[in-house]
């Protein structure tokens, strides 16, 4: 499998804000991640993040997050630093 890099917007609902889901997908699927921007409050978390890894593993990681209740949207524009 070839490697891919995906830019994503992740929205975590209140019940998942304190869960280590990014760590979990990194370990479980061998994903390298780069958090480009984050805003976390007591009630919601938003991450602009890059996932890099084998294509099938990145897709599995995205599916895992969605099943846990994270809203996952692909980013089609550059992230302003």
What do the predicted segments below correspond to?
Residues 1-46, 50-81:
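Long, contiguous binding/interaction regions
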């Amino acid at each position: 499998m070839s490697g891919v890099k995906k830019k994503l917007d992740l929205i975590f609902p209140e019940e998942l804000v304190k869960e280590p889901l990014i760590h979990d997908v990194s370990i479980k699927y061998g994903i390298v991640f780069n958090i480009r921007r984050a805003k976390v409050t007591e009630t919601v978390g938003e991450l602009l993040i890059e996932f890099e890894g084998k294509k099938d593993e990145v897709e599995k990681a995205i599916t895992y997050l969605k099943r846990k209740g994270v809203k996952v949207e692909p980013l089609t524009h550059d992230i302003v630093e």
